[in-house]
Amino acid sequence: MIVLRFLSLLLISLLCVSVVQADLYKKIDQQGRVFFTDKPEGRGYKLIMRTPKKGTVAYRQFEQNRRKLTPLIRQQAKKHKVDSALVMAVIHAESAYDQRAISRAGAVGLMQLMPKTAERFGVTNRNNPAQNISGGTRYLRHLLELFKFDIRLTLAAYNAGESAVAKYGNKIPPYPETQTYVKRVVKHYQYYLSDNKSL
């Protein structure tokens, strides 16, 4: 949706198991390009987000929120015909299941809805978990249909916008943040599928 949006979240993604667990590093090169990675190579990278480890207070809060919200996520996913594992993966990356998450760009809630997106999909209160998940899931369904159920393009559009994906010929835009976002959410998606947490 908005470049660098996820950096404003206190808890962001990569919280569950080793397959998706990593710290986040940032680098700005001489041309001003921004790069994100969980495996820094070479100089210039700075640690900007450390992943809470199992057993920590942050991890326990994450798990508590996830368990509490899972029935609601399943309900909305079924209603709008979207894989619940995909919805969980997006929520994991967008807000780490923190319904109070707010970005510097103005995105709010579990699925980090911007005002126009919320209005477009009938959300009147972005802070309400049920409304936020409903609106975000409806948006995912719209994007899935728009991009012929290509998961990666759907995620790229969720992050950078539909027009950005269209601008680059229905390919993932060459934005470091968007490319990192897509890879991260796909990892979460694979985790939720394999771990059956979405069933």
Language-model segments: residues:
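Positively charged n-region of N-terminal signal peptides that target proteins for export
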Residues: M1-F6
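Sec/Tat signal peptide C-region and signal peptidase I cleavage site
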Residues: S18-A22
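A short beta-strand micro-motif
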Residues: Y25-D29
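Catalytic glycan-binding domains that act on GlcNAc-containing polysaccharides
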Residues: P40-L199
